[in-house]
């Protein structure tokens, strides 16, 4: 006897299973089954496809008029941080740039101070609250970065919190050491601080899967970023890079040359960088909510990347300064509107390709897969990025069990 059948599904979203990320035109290929059925046993998918009455189960969910998809994957977050920075909104309204706010002692450095002052247990409670919000919105796989400690003690504290969350909730969660995220005030120079972070790589390896660096004007140069990435690979890390967010320094090209698993942001990436994506499996993780929140007009050139047969994914970039949202559904809407992605491209970018960007087996519904699913209160898959700003996730299913039920009920 099976454990659960989800039946009469209006649309069942079945992203293509592949060893490599979907590239170029492949991103627009999505199998959407009308009147679908999903069968689950022992936390695994037994069947997913067109309607069938050939299976029995102890529990049945009628998903008439609903969409069912793989659980979402958020491939770029800064989940563990102390404090908040709502006071910076007035500075943004005055026209202050991100780098200007950073030079004033705000930005990342403000969060660094708050994170350093927050105990590990309090940091855990805050991050847990934010993670549960993500789960309620349909996310069951997350990447979580450090980068707000900027010293040994506090970088380790962030990574330990991230690992504790993964263990408590048994999530598909990857952890990223982003020690070179900014340069703390106490550092004698960028170069000296970078060497401190490189020296930490062997110690943080037990808590982190990836090593990341912020390659940007006023932070770390292309040459410094390459040095760090090479040292990280020597220490056994797969590497990522925050690249070309503000200035076209060539971070995307560097990521491809160093065979990074992903390059993230890429708002200012050059045509040369986009062309190099053609022969690379590095995933371009685009973060349109960041551009939206910062009030900028120029978004990452997703269409240019796809035209060059690149692989792209979408993520929230959840952080307290430049993307204060942990709702990946909102990112889906912004991507459709501002990056000009089709609904199919959006869905693949938050499922199978996002999973490839953090090297996990998720984002698909195939026989034998973990039964990590979302039942959406929406008539079709196009509706979710169309009707923006609310939570469409009705039920979130982890390992075949309903762990979130957002069904609304009112008392008169």
Swiss-Prot record:
Q: What is the lineage of its organism?
A: Bacteria, Bacillati, Bacillota, Bacilli, Bacillales
Q: Which gene encodes it?
A: hutI
Q: Name one GO biological process term.
A: L-histidine catabolic process to glutamate and formate
Molecular function in Gene Ontology: imidazolonepropionase activity; iron ion binding; zinc ion binding
Xref: InterPro entries: Amidohydro-rel, HutI, Metal-dep_hydrolase_composite, Metal_Hydrolase
Identify the residues that bind Zn(2+): 76, 78, 242, 317
Q: Which residues bind 4-imidazolone-5-propanoate?
A: 85, 148, 181, 245, 322
So what does this one do? Catalyzes the hydrolytic cleavage of the carbon-nitrogen bond in imidazolone-5-propanoate to yield N-formimidoyl-L-glutamate. It is the third step in the universal histidine degradation pathway.
Identification of the protein by name? Imidazolonepropionase
Q: Which family does it belong to?
A: Belongs to the metallo-dependent hydrolases superfamily. HutI family.
Where does this chain mainly localize?
Answer: cytoplasm
Its Gene Ontology cellular component terms are:
cytoplasm
Q: Which CDD domains match?
A: Imidazolone-5PH
Source domain of life is Bacteria
């Amino acid at each position: 006897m099976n454990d659960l059948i989800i039946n009469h599904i209006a649309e069942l979203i079945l992203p293509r299973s592949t060893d490599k990320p979907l590239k170029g035109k492949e991103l627009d290929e999505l199998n959407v089954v009308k009147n679908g059925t999903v069968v689950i046993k022992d936390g695994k998918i037994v069947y997913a496809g067109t309607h069938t009455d050939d299976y029995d189960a102890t529990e049945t969910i009628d998903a008439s008029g609903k969409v069912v998809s793989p659980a979402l994957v958020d491939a770029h977050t800064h989940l563990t941080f102390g404090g908040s920075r709502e006071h910076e909104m007035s500075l943004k309204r005055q026209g202050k740039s991100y780098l200007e706010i950073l030079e004033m002692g705000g930005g990342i450095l403000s969060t660094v101070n708050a994170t350093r002052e927050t105990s590990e247990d309090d940091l855990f409670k805050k991050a847990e609250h934010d993670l549960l919000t993500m789960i309620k919105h349909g996310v069951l796989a997350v990447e979580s970065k450090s980068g707000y400690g900027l010293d040994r003690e506090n970088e380790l504290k962030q990574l330990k919190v991230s690992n504790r969350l993964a263990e408590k909730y048994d999530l598909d969660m990857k952890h990223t050491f982003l020690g070179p995220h900014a340069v703390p005030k106490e550092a004698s120079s960028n170069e000296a601080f970078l060497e401190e972070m490189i020296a930490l790589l062997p110690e943080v390896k037990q808590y982190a899967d990836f090593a990341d660096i912020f390659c940007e004007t006023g932070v770390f140069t292309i040459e410094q970023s390459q040095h760090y990435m090479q040292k990280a690979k020597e220490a056994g890390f797969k590497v990522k890079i925050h690249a070309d967010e503000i200035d076209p320094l060539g971070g995307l090209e560097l990521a491809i040359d160093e065979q990074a698993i992903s390059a993230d942001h890429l708002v200012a990436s050059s045509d040369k960088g986009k062309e190099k994506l053609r022969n690379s499996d590095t995933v371009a993780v685009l973060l349109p909510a960041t551009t939206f929140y910062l009030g900028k007009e120029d978004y990452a050139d997703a269409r240019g990347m796809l035209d060059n047969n690149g692989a792209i994914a979408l993520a929230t970039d959840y952080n307290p300064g430049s993307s204060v949202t942990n709702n990946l559904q909102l990112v889906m809407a912004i991507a459709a509107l501002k990056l000009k992605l089709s609904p199919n491209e959006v869905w693949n970018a938050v499922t199978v390709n996002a999973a490839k960007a953090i090297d996990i087996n998720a984002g698909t519904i195939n026989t034998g897969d973990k039964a990590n699913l979302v039942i959406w209160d929406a008539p079709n898959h196009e509706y979710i990025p169309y009707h923006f700003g609310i939570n469409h996730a009705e039920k979130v299913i982890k390992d075949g069990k309903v762990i979130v039920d957002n069904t609304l009920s009112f008392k008169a």
